[in-house]
Amino acid sequence: MNQEINNFYIKDQEIFDQIKLEEKRQKESINLIASENFVSQDVLKVQGTILTNKYAEGYPEKRFYNGCQYIDEIEKIAIERATELFKAKYANVQPHSGSQANMAVFQALLNPNDRILGLSLSDGGHLTHGSKMNFSGKYYESYFYGLNSKTETIDYAEVEKIAFAIRPKLIITGYSSYSKIIDFKSFRKIANKVNAYLMADIAHISGLVASGLHPCPLEAQADVVTSTTHKTLRGPRGGLILTNNKEIINKINKAVFPGGQGGPLMHIIAAKAVAFKEALHSDFIKYQKQILKNACFFAENLQKKGYRIISKSTENHLFLVDVKSKNPNFTGKKISDILNKVNIVVNKNVIPFDKETPLITSGIRLGTPAMTTRGFKENEFAKVSDFIDEAITNHNDLNYLNNLKQKVITLSKNFPLKI
C-alpha cells in the first residue's frame, strides 16, 4: 500500500500506535464494505495541510473573517469542478457529511412537520430519509414506500399510489443498499403529479453517475441532488449538494451556513477539489466500469455457490446476500463476524422483509469499490468468492480459518494501493 506512514510520526504514542495498527489492518484485509474506499495520495496529503488552521465562515468573497483570499480560490475551484463533473449549474461543497447535506436540503425546502416520502430503512433506505431515530423522522412527518415482495425492486406504481395518498412535500430517492438502476424520470413524474420536490441522494452511486454509468438525476430534473464525496467518488469524507435551480441553491446555501454549520473544513474542501479533478480523468471512468464488472461477476459467482442474491443480481457497485439461504440458523452478524476472523471485512445488513433485528440481520452487504481501487478484477473476486464460501462452510474449524486468513493476507498484500 502506498499510503504508508513510515515517515509519519507524532509524539502521542498511544494514538500513533493505533494508527499503525489500523494501517496494518487495511493492508492485510479484503475490504468489501460498499461505503468505503481508498483515497489517492494527493487526497490524503491535502487533508493534512495547514488549511486546517483557517476559519472561513461564509462563502467565497462573503466571509466573516479576513485572510480568506486563498481559501476563496480553493472553494471556487472545488465548486467549478463539482459542477463540471456532474453537469450541474450550482454546487455547495461545504457539508461535512452526507447526512448534513440532507439536513440542509430539508431545512431549505421544508417546514417542520411537512410530509416526506422515502424508501423504508429495512428495504435499503437511509436514516436521513425519514427514520424515527433521526432528525428526518423526528421533525418531519415521514412516510415510506417499500420494495415489491416478489422482485425485491421498487414498484413505481406503488410509490405513486402512496404519494397520492399522503401528498408529500418532498420525495426522496437514492439508497444505501439497493442494487438496481434507479428510474429518476419515473420519480420526477410522480413528484410532478403531487406537486412535490424531488431529492436524489446519490451518496453510494455518485462515481457511477459522474462516469455516465448510471442515469443522472439532474438530467431527470431532480430539484436537488445530495451526495457524499467518499464511497464510489473516492474522495475525502464529506458531503456535496447539487442543483440546477438558482432559488434552491440560495436557500441551500443559507441552510448550510448559518443554518446548520459554522466554519467549513477547508482542508477537506481542498481534498474534495482534488478528488473531483481525479474523477474528471478518463481513468476514473475505466475504474467505475471495473467496479461494475467486478460486482456483477462477484454476485453471479456467489449465486452459483448457493447464496441467494437479493433481487437476483446487481446493476451497481453493491449487492445483498441472504445468508439464511445457505443455512436458516445463520445471521448477518454471525457471518460478518466469521469473515472478519479471516480478514474479509463486510457489514451485516437487513434484507427486504427481514425478520431479524437490525443488530442481527439476515444478510450481509458486499461492495467492490475499495478492492477495485487496489487492482482487483474478476480473477481476484473469484478467489474472494471461494474464500467467503470456505470460511462459512468451515466456520467451526479454527485451524482451517487460520490457514485461510493467511491466504487472504497474501492476496491483499499482492495488491498494494497504487494511485
UniProtKB/Swiss-Prot annotation:
Matching NCBIfam families: PRK00011.1
One of the Pfam families matching this protein, by short name: SHMT
Domain of life of the source: Bacteria
Protein name, as recorded: Serine hydroxymethyltransferase
Reactions mediated catalytically: (6R)-5,10-methylene-5,6,7,8-tetrahydrofolate + glycine + H2O = (6S)-5,6,7,8-tetrahydrofolate + L-serine
Cofactor: pyridoxal 5'-phosphate
Top-level EC class as recorded in UniProt: transferase
MF annotations from Gene Ontology: glycine hydroxymethyltransferase activity; pyridoxal phosphate binding
UniProt subunit comment: Homodimer.
Cytoplasm found in the keyword field: yes
EC numbers: 2.1.2.1
Positions bearing N6-(pyridoxal phosphate)lysine: 231
Record-linked InterPro entries: PyrdxlP-dep_Trfase, PyrdxlP-dep_Trfase_major, PyrdxlP-dep_Trfase_small, Ser_HO-MeTrfase, Ser_HO-MeTrfase-like, Ser_HO-MeTrfase_PLP_BS, SHMT-like_dom
Gene coding for it: glyA
Any single biological process term in GO: glycine biosynthetic process from serine
Cellular component GO terms held in the UniProt record: cytosol
Taxonomic source organism: Phytoplasma mali (strain AT)
Alphabetic keyword roster: Amino-acid biosynthesis, Cytoplasm, One-carbon metabolism, Pyridoxal phosphate, Transferase
Family: Belongs to the SHMT family.
Pathway note: One-carbon metabolism; tetrahydrofolate interconversion; Amino-acid biosynthesis; glycine biosynthesis; glycine from L-serine: step 1/1
Coiled-coil regions listed in the entry: none
Protein purpose: Catalyzes the reversible interconversion of serine and glycine with tetrahydrofolate (THF) serving as the one-carbon carrier. This reaction serves as the major source of one-carbon groups required for the biosynthesis of purines, thymidylate, methionine, and other important biomolecules. Also exhibits THF-independent aldolase activity toward beta-hydroxyamino acids, producing glycine and aldehydes, via a retro-aldol mechanism.
Ligand binding ((6S)-5,6,7,8-tetrahydrofolate): 121, 125-127
